[in-house]
Amino acid sequence: MWTRYSQLWWKRCERRSLLSGAAAAALARPAIGGAAKTLIFVPQSPLASLDPVWTSAMTTRNVGFMIYDLLFGRDEFMNPKPQMLEGYTVQDDGKRWVMKLRPNLWFHDGERVLARDCVASLKRWMQRDPGGATLIARMDALEAPDDRTILLRLKKPFPALPTLLSKFQTAAVMVPERIANGTDPFKQMKESIGSGPFRFLADEYVIGSHAAMAPFDRYVPRDEPASFTSGGHRTMVDRVEWKMIPNAATAANALLTGEVDWLEMPMPDRCRC
């Protein structure tokens, strides 16, 4: 996602791999705080799926962090931090986790995020993910006693829960209950409805060619500064387009001419380290 963290990431990447000479001068960056802008991004491989539970593909993971959100994120030091959660308590010698959702969480379809959505999402994810299978073996119950409370009761302590729920690959993303319950964990979701800072523009999606996202106007960032996948993610462009350009030389030329703004994998011979 293009947020304040992404801006810092961009600067770090510039130091490592800016195009030299006139090429660097031609690099078209999205304006921060200026007129309405579109960021055009070229991923390293085609975006074939939008279900981060179904696949561990890097492109799916990356777009997933724009569309979806997690109960826990990770800061830049890889420490898990509450993300969709207002807070949590661990009781009964580590065998009872009570997690409280933040208020004002909304899905892109206009429905409020409720604890039962998160319970259904976690149950689908646990059937697909190896770490989730470990959690199933230790679990007594996973319930939603009210709209904002997720209750996990365990047979024995599992202190690594925040680390597990904040991981990147086959991430435990939150989706509406109807989608989580209605989708086999071993099949792809047919809808890409999350609660993240960007909403997916399904009518513009062309598999293997083009995808687009726009800011979600009901997304409420956390108060903390953004730090990797945790903290307050604030959108800084008005539209993001993923443009698939399989040929590396063609992609490099598109960057030089200003047709695109960002290559995930620039050609090494065009980079200066």
What are these model-derived regions, one by one?
Residues R102, P221-C273:
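Ligand-site clamp/hinge motif
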Residues E86-G131, P145, L151, W242, ...:
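Aromatic- and charge-enriched surface segment that lines or borders ligand/interaction sites
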Residues V42-D92, K123, I193:
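N-terminal lobe/hinge region of extracytoplasmic solute-binding protein
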Residues K100, T134-N181, P185-V206:
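Surface-exposed binding/hinge segments that line
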Residues E191-F228, A251:
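Bilobed "Venus flytrap"/periplasmic-binding protein-like clamshell domains
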Residues A36-S45, R96-V98, G196, A211, ...:
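Short, well-ordered beta-strand elements
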Residues A48-V53, N79-K81, A160-T163, I207-A211, ...:
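Short, solvent-exposed loop/turn elements at domain surfaces
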Residues M1-C13, A24-A26:
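N-terminal secretory signal peptides
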